[in-house]
Amino acid sequence: MGPRRRSRKPEAPRRRSPSPTPTPGPSRRGPSLGASSHQHSRRRQGWLKEIRKLQKSTHLLIRKLPFSRLAREICVKFTRGVDFNWQAQALLALQEAAEAFLVHLFEDAYLLTLHAGRVTLFPKDVQLARRIRGLEEGLG
């Protein structure tokens, strides 16, 4: 058996001398406030990076084959079943125009979102943007 511990008599609590520079110890409550905000900003930077990357790019965002099928389907619908042959350059020009229209529409709708004091884009913002644009701007 090891040495026995002596029982101590109750004493007055000892006073600790104040240390000149407190050293931060490990926290038992979880990560500190700074660490959680760092993780939050790192998570937020992911979608911000994606937005900035897409804003800098000039490539088409809608895939060519699904857009081509949609354009042909709409053409067949409005020509009463007559199927036209499409040149690749014609489909590409149509896709460029469609994407430019959508980008401009969403830019206007997001400005309306900010004007309303929100961050989330709602369908009513897109509807109001189309209504403000009128027939000349492609309301249709």
UniProtKB/Swiss-Prot annotation:
InterPro entries: Histone-fold (IPR009072), Histone_H2A/H2B/H3 (IPR007125), Histone_H3/CENP-A (IPR000164)
Low complexity compositional bias, start-end: 26-37
Alphabetical list of Gene3D superfamilies matching this protein: Histone, subunit A
Positions bearing Phosphoserine: 7, 17, 19, 27, 68
Ranges for region CATD: 75-116
Keyword RNA-binding among UniProt keywords: no
Changes after translation: Ubiquitinated. Interaction with herpes virus HSV-1 ICP0 protein, leads to its degradation by the proteasome pathway.
GO BP, sorted A to Z: CENP-A containing chromatin assembly; establishment of mitotic spindle orientation; kinetochore assembly; mitotic cytokinesis; protein localization to CENP-A containing chromatin; protein localization to chromosome, centromeric region
Effect of residue 17 to A: Impaired mitotic chromosome congression and chromosome segregation
UniProt cross-references to Pfam families, sorted A to Z: Histone
Residue numbers spanned by region Important for flexibility of DNA ends that protrude from nucleosomes: 39-54
Location within or outside the cell: Nucleus; Chromosome, Centromere
PROSITE patterns from the UniProt entry: HISTONE_H3_2
Entry's free-text remark on domains: The CATD (CENPA targeting domain) region is responsible for the more compact structure of nucleosomes containing CENPA. It is necessary and sufficient to mediate the localization into centromeres.
Protein name, entry field: Histone H3-like centromeric protein A
